[in-house]
Amino acid sequence: MYELVQVSEKCYYINCPAKIGVYVADKDHVYLVDSGNDKDAGRKVRQILDKNGWHLAAILNTHSNADHIGGNKYLQGQTGCKVYSGGIEAAFTKYPVLEPSFLYGGYPCKDLRHKFLMAQESDVTDFSDESFPKEIEVIPLPGHFFDMVGFRMPDNVVFLADCISSRETLDKYAVSFIYDVEAYLKTLDMVEEMEAAMFVPAHAEASADIKKLVRYNRDKVHEVAEKILSICKEPICFERILQEVFKGYGLSMNFEQYVLVGSTVRSYLSWLKDTGRLSAEFQDCMLLWQSV
């Protein structure tokens, strides 16, 4: 864990739970793609940079999930580096309590205010700022989270953030986090047609060809959608739907999984209703969902 892996002349990744990209701009300065999940991750990254004689120019955040921005505060405090982000992701990075609040749908209890869902805050500079390195292409990858992006480096390595999960992860957990199902599927279509010397997803193996994995992710989305539709053959409330999803996939429920899977199931319900496959009605002061 935390090994430095070279994928091109100027690009590396640090192998950790959410891969951290490294772009060597010149012999002295590097840009990180994300920063790991906490202060300890940031410290390990700093040791790697020091060992190679690299100065940290900036962190480029793909999105604001805590496992991608958790090292920001430590690294920014140690080096004075900029942290680049954009859109809603920038707001969540500056005000991290927004993530557990959004997931829970209200003020999060202490069980949800921890480093896995709520990073420490960091100062943010927008991607549009003149100081952002012009040689790096910012690629919009919405769907998994609000304004998630990837980055194409000058030597044609693309860091894909969380837009695809590994087969192993999908086989084990089935329901990967998705904020906007329609946007996510469009992102998968776009990524499937993308060409690069190497793709580096945060939660799957780096590869020059990711088309099969993209298709596997897409198939899993449609599988989950069909499962939800089958659960909704008779009018049913959200909590019962969530219970059946957990039981159907053999998932274990705790506060963290309740909000992560629960938020995703709500996103599926919205998508299925908006595409005419689910109806919703209020009965006896309850919102009930039913397949059309």
Which role does the model predict for each range below?
Residues 22, 29, 41-43, 57, ...:
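A structural signal for the main folded, soluble domain(s) of proteins
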Residues 37, 135-225:
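Metallo-beta-lactamase
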Residues 230-292:
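C-terminal regulatory/interaction regions
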